[in-house]
Amino acid sequence: MSDNSKTRVVVGMSGGVDSSVTALLLKEQGYDVIGIFMKNWDDTDENGVCTATEDYKDVVAVADQIGIPYYSVNFEKEYWDRVFEYXXAEYRAGRTPNPDVMCNKEIKFKAFLDYAMTLGADYVATGHYARVARDEDGTVHMLRGVDNGKDQTYFLSQLSQEQLQKTMFPLGHLEKPEVRKLAEEAGLSTAKKKDSTGICFIGEKNFKNFLSNYLPAQPGRMMTVDGRDMGEHAGLMYYTIGQRGGLGIGGQHGGDNAPWFVVGKDLSKNILYVGQGFYHDSLMSTSLEASQVHFTREMPEEFTLECTAKFRYRQPDSKVTVHVKGDKAEVIFAEPQRAITPGQAVVFYDGEECLGGGLIDNAYRDGQVCQYI
């Protein structure tokens, strides 16, 4: 049996149950474990309590319980520059960004990884639900987490081979209830702490209120595709393609009580397009264009790939054909897809393996660009 005590693993600890159990398992496996709390956002909740302070207390309690050293490191500047500014620019451009994808790429597996290396780390570990498999030649494959409902490879799809080679995901083979059970059996103080939800820098706060602090809203007209005026929208950045709630129009227009959905945007005219029906024609597309396309393993500059893809988190895989050229790709769907949203990630899979992904620029319906931005 290999001597793990000579291998130093630096664990990103958030104060949640997943990262707590990650540290616990590595410690039990004999690794030299250090816990790091990342402070990425200067945050107070509606009661004036700094949530990061509360989370750090949980990290300290768990680290003391399992007997590992811990540090707190501040990445607020890196986070602002590399994640928040990106997200704000995407919202201004009428797109719907996925800050968690960028946070993993730029903070958790770049700024944090670099910092861990200064502590003499051989690996970093996080509480993500994903797996890594290592070939004899050293190539690392990123595989889906065993818990299908919790699998987080979608958010990890921009990680590079170099980043993955330095990464461990100890929870990848576990299901969430097993993780909670391990925390309870070990008496960890975070065993019953509820999971955090929402965008990493917004947390539980009201999204609309948060965004309006940083980006001035520009109300405009809400219209149907055939030109009927449906009232005013609050600002295009507050709406995403395919969204149902928050339109304030119900079934009052005409006799049809079918629900209304956001079916398009025109940034240049500041118009929000709405339509009735979950599968409204304007919501359906047959292909997309992506940029910032990246693979977790070395691939040719130009190639075609038959695989499956996800266009949003927790969506079932769909069969696609991907034509890759440099960091751009055309993705053709085997079946029409609903609400393909510019700014979101498209992520490619070959069975269990996450191959990588890109950011959606445009959706197309039979060769015609969809009016989504």
Curated annotation (Swiss-Prot):
Gene3D superfamilies assigned to the protein according to its UniProt record, in alphabetical order: Adenine nucleotide alpha hydrolases-like domains, HUPs, Translation factors
Gene from which the chain derives: mnmA
GO terms (BP aspect): tRNA wobble position uridine thiolation
Record-linked PANTHER family: MITOCHONDRIAL TRNA-SPECIFIC 2-THIOURIDYLASE 1, TRNA 5-METHYLAMINOMETHYL-2-THIOURIDYLATE -METHYLTRANSFERASE
Cellular compartment(s): Cytoplasm
InterPro entries membership: MnmA-like (IPR004506), MnmA-like_C (IPR046885), MnmA-like_central (IPR046884), MnmA-like_central_sf (IPR023382), Rossmann-like_a/b/a_fold (IPR014729)
Residues annotated for ATP binding in this entry: G12, M13, S14, G15, G16, V17, D18, S19, M38, G127
Region (Interaction with tRNA): 150-152, 312-313
GO molecular function, one term: tRNA-uridine 2-sulfurtransferase activity
Organism annotation: Streptococcus pneumoniae serotype 19F (strain G54)
Intrachain disulfide bonds: C103-C200
Annotated function: Catalyzes the 2-thiolation of uridine at the wobble position (U34) of tRNA, leading to the formation of s(2)U34.
Predominant place of localization: cytoplasm
Name of the protein described by the UniProt record: tRNA-specific 2-thiouridylase MnmA
Site features described as Interaction with tRNA, chain residue numbers: H128, Q344
Active site: C103, C200
Record has RNA-binding as a keyword: yes
Catalytic activity: S-sulfanyl-L-cysteinyl-[protein] + uridine(34) in tRNA + AH2 + ATP = 2-thiouridine(34) in tRNA + L-cysteinyl-[protein] + A + AMP + diphosphate + H(+)
Keywords: ATP-binding, Cytoplasm, Disulfide bond, Nucleotide-binding, RNA-binding, Transferase, tRNA processing, tRNA-binding
Residue numbers spanned by region Interaction with target base in tRNA: 98-100
CC terms in the record's Gene Ontology section: cytoplasm
EC number: 2.8.1.13
Protein family membership: Belongs to the MnmA/TRMU family.
